[in-house]
Design a protein with these regions (language model features):
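N-terminal assembly/attachment segments of tailed bacteriophage virion structural proteins
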Residues: 1-146
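Fibrous stalk/shaft segments of extracellular and virion attachment machinery
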Residues: 150-154
C-alpha cells in the first residue's frame, strides 16, 4: 500500500482558496472507490471511480506538515456489505449555503486494500489520514460521522 497519488480537484482548489479568504468550508463526507483513474486526470474528477462506499469521518486537527500549516483529517474504513478492493479515498465538502457537495481531493493506490464483508469480519478496521496543506487562517470544519466520539488531542 503506497497511497502516494494525491490530487486536489480543480473545484476543490477553488473551495480551499475561498476558505483561506474567509469562507467556511465544511468537509461533509469521505467516500471510497473501487476503481482506478489515470493519475493525470484525477484533478478533473467529480466523484470516485467504480463502486462508491461511504467511509467515516473521525476528526480534523490543525498540524504542521514539513514546515507548512495543514489540517489532518482522520477517516475510518470498516467492513462493507460485500468484499471489495478499495483503490480511492475521497473527501467532499461544501461552503455555507452551497446546494451540493464538491469533490475536494482524491488519494489513489494502484494495489488497493481488500475490504472484507462485515458479515465475515466484524473486527476489520482501517484508519487513514489525509493531510491538506493550507493556511492556518482557513476556516475548515468537519461533519463527524454518526456514532463517532470526539477526543481532545486527536
Amino acid at each position: 500500500m503506497s497511497w502516494e497519488t494525491l490530487a486536489y480537484t480543480d473545484a476543490g482548489i477553488e473551495l480551499l482558496m475561498d476558505a483561506v479568504s474567509g469562507k467556511q468550508l465544511t468537509i461533509t463526507q469521505a467516500v471510497g472507490g473501487s476503481g482506478l483513474a489515470n493519475a493525470a486526470v484525477l484533478h478533473a474528477q467529480t466523484d470516485v471511480t467504480g463502486e462508491r462506499h461511504a467511509l467515516e469521518l473521525l476528526g480534523i486537527k490543525s498540524v504542521e506538515e514539513n514546515g507548512s500549516a495543514a489540517r489532518r483529517v482522520k477517516i475510518r474504513i470498516t467492513g462493507a456489505e460485500d468484499t471489495y478492493t478499495l483503490h480511492q479515498i475521497a473527501l467532499f465538502g461544501r461552503q455555507t449555503g452551497a446546494a451540493e457537495d464538491t469533490l475536494l481531493l482524491l488519494v489513489q493506490d494502484d494495489r488497493g486494500v481488500e475490504i472484507p464483508a462485515a458479515s465475515t469480519d466484524q473486527e476489520f478496521e482501517f484508519v487513514f489520514t489525509v493531510v491538506i496543506v493550507i493556511s492556518r487562517d482557513a476556516e475548515i470544519v468537519i461533519n463527524l460521522s454518526a456514532g463517532c466520539r470526539f477526543f481532545s488531542g486527536y
